[in-house]
């Protein structure tokens, strides 16, 4: 390379004046190509691996590229909703074949024919502009100077897409919003700031002599400043659970945020994966996507608008997270994805797995049996790893970060050999199914103010539940985990949910969730205490619970709608039902054996009235006290998984202050009688004795003041006080308390 040209490239690419918040030296983009995910220095090792231990992965990649060359076409390159995998397969095969000294131009020629004069790259009606940038970087050295400028100019037109600026603007979305980063197809739909696509372009075209060099520099400067100073702290606040759940997370952020951070790392040498706290989004992502897996299917739980998948977009990015963080859990998931055939359509991603990273399963790592993702307020619990028959539970309460989050604070799920406590069945979109954006698909307490007028009320009338923040873009308080501790025998969580309800009707709403973890062969229990204070005694309160199988009610049952609605009233009522192993639908293989049984003992209020409602035509009923909602809120996707066809409505006598106290027993299917439960009350606490004499738990939960109490496990003489603060030292060696 001529000296003057090398000097020019250094001048335009070296961001000498920029310093990331945690970098001691200026950040500079390397001169050579490839820069994105791969470097020239690493090509020889990659080529050697493709000829050795990675031969099977490379054979699949080359077969895809060769098929495309023979067909003379790149599949899906004009499909706006698909990833053009053949484009990347051809570009990567070119790099490896060229490195090995074999003919490789045919792969480049196919891409050049597809790109033509560059119009299809720059077409703002639809273009996978992020993936075109990766391919451009990978075949850069095979292009002549005119082609580099032509296609680089086409790519450069995207640097001001949507915002009108070649910079990160956060226009119409925060760091925690999926469209800020871009979708997994890296196309125009649902791309606002499109940070990932623009970063890939700015890194790819730098130094190519395009008309957009200044814009590329401006965008890189914006990234180098704003990501360390603003984005990383925001991700630390949010934590490892994507704010919009693994539903909208899988559509983009779980895949494309690691793309962006890894492209920056390989192009500059600055590893921003490690810039945040241990509980930040990227360091904790692999843990979250592991904890989401429900044992009886190995698939992600139906939480918020996500669920039913096994990887949620992580298959493509897990190799990048694993190598950037040396993360054994991400590597384990990448190898699982390869074994499950997740790279069949996109074999290029399998070649990014770094074999020097050790893979370890949760059991091999000795992960705890419970985990708090403090930013989102997500608590996961289980009885064992590597056991499809294990018990699994979720409890959540956290702030609203971004638009697509559903309002489900205080919601919980339980499974063992199938779903036991689920959310309202079926799926729906936020735009066409407003009922899905209300409270009655979740397991929480309603406070019915007949004069409340909620947002988004079309076919989603007053449900007595939480304020509806879905599709609001501003961060706001809804609920928070105020106490958490995990021990070998129990996991305890407590949440203040008051901010989630309209202040006109709720003075205080809290929920305490205590999972009593049994030893192998023992039954397990969950204790849930709700302390609810309304502004008026006339505001009726209900404890809502969704179950997948038709429950059997104790006491005298009054049939209101035969086969669908029945009511029983009394003190200490027991309700029971079986698990549903196929609750994830026919496409989800059931890994567990048999079924389990759940008993629910309603101890408070006393007396209580319990309505069982469900079955065909009654699955999605409105609130029982809202006259305009007395119909089945069905929709196009209500029959899809998760299957959860029944709802229990526990009604309390009218009073300003109400306690709901429930003990759930998780037992084998053959068990027909619930274990003994004895309740004693005083002004300070509810006190429980649960189980037989030989396996008796003693539990006390405070009914006023701090959300504390005590627990005594079977065989233990001394009660252990429950915490009134968050304890996460077992996770991080320090406690993670989310910033306000």
Give names to the regions the model predicted.
Residues 544-617:
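Polysaccharide-binding surfaces and accessory modules of carbohydrate-active proteins
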Residues 302-364:
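N-terminal leader/propeptide and maturation segments of large enzyme subunits in energy/redox metabolism
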Residues 34-285:
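Aromatic-lined, polymer-binding surfaces characteristic
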């Amino acid at each position: 390379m001529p000296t003057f040209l090398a000097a020019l490239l250094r001048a335009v690419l070296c961001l000498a004046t920029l310093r990331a918040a945690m970098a001691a030296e200026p950040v500079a983009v390397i001169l050579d190509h490839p820069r994105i995910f791969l470097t020239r220095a690493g090509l020889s090792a990659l080529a050697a691996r493709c000829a050795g231990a990675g031969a099977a992965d490379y054979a699949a990649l080359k077969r895809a590229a060769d098929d495309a060359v023979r067909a003379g076409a790149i599949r899906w390159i004009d499909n706006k909703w698909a990833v053009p995998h053949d484009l990347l397969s051809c570009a990567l095969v070119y790099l490896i074949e060229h490195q090995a000294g074999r003919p490789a131009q045919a792969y480049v020629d196919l891409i050049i024919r597809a790109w033509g004069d560059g119009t299809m790259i720059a077409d703002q009606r639809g273009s996978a502009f992020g993936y075109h940038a990766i391919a451009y970087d990978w075949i850069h050295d095979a292009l002549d100077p005119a082609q580099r400028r032509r296609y680089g100019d086409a790519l450069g037109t995207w640097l001001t897409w949507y915002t009108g600026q070649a910079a990160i603007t956060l226009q119409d979305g925060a760091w925690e919003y999926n469209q800020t980063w871009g979708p997994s197809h890296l196309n125009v739909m649902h791309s606002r700031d499109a940070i990932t696509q623009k970063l890939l372009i700015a890194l790819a075209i730098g130094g190519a002599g395009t008309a957009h060099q200044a814009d590329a520099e401006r965008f890189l400067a914006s990234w180098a400043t704003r990501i360390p100073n603003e984005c990383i702290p925001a991700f630390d606040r949010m934590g490892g659970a994507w704010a919009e759940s693994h539903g909208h997370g899988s559509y983009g952020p779980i895949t494309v945020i690691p793309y962006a951070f890894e492209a920056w790392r390989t192009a500059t040498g600055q590893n921003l994966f490690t810039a945040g706290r241990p509980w930040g989004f990227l360091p904790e992502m692999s843990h979250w996507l592991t904890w989401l897996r429900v044992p009886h299917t190995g698939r992600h739980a139906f939480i918020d608008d996500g669920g039913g998948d096994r990887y949620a977009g992580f298959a493509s990015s897990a190799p990048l997270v694993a190598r950037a963080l040396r993360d054994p859990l991400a590597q384990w998931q990448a190898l699982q994805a390869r074994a499950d055939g997740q790279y069949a359509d996109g074999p290029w991603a399998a070649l990014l797995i770094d074999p020097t990273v050790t893979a370890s399963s949760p059991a091999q790592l000795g992960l705890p049996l419970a985990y708090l993702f403090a930013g989102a307020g997500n608590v996961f619990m289980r009885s064992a790893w590597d056991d499809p028959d294990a018990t699994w539970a979720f409890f959540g309460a956290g702030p609203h970060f971004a638009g697509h989050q559903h309002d489900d604070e205080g919601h919980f799920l339980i499974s063992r050999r199938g779903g036991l406590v689920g959310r309202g069945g079926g799926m729906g979109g936020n735009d066409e199914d407003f009922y899905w954006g209300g409270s009655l698909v979740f397991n929480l307490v309603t406070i019915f103010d007949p004069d409340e007028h909620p947002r988004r009320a079309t076919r989603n009338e007053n449900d007595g539940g939480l304020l509806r923040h879905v599709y609001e873009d501003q961060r706001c308080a809804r609920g928070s985990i105020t106490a958490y501790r995990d021990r070998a025998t129990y996991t305890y969580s407590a949440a203040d949910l008051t901010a989630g309800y309209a202040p006109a009707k709720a003075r205080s709403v809290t929920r305490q969730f205590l999972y009593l973890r049994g030893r192998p062969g023992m039954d397990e229990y969950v204790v849930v205490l709700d302390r609810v204070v309304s502004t008026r005694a006339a505001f009726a309160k209900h404890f809502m619970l969704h179950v997948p199988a038709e429950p059997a009610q104790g006491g005298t049952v009054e049939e209101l709608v035969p086969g669908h609605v029945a009511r029983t009233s009394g003190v200490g009522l027991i309700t029971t039902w079986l698990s549903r192993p196929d609750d994830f639908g026919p496409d989800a293989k059931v890994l567990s054996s048999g079924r389990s049984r759940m008993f629910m003992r309603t101890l408070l209020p006393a007396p209580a009235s319990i309505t069982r409602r469900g079955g065909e035509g009654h699955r999605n009923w409105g609130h029982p006290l809202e006259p305009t909602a007395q119909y089945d809120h069905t929709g196009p996707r209500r029959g899809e998984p998760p299957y959860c066809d029944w709802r229990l409505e526990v009604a309390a006598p009218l009073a300003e202050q109400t306690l709901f106290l429930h003990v759930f027993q998780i037992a084998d299917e053959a068990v027909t009688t619930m274990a003994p439960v004895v309740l004693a009350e005083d002004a300070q606490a509810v006190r429980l004795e649960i189980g037989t004499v030989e396996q008796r738990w003693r539990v006390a939960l405070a009914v006023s003041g701090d959300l504390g109490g005590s627990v005594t496990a079977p065989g233990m003489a001394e009660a252990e006080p429950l915490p009134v603060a968050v304890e996460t030292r077992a996770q991080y060696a320090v406690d993670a308390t989310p910033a306000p």
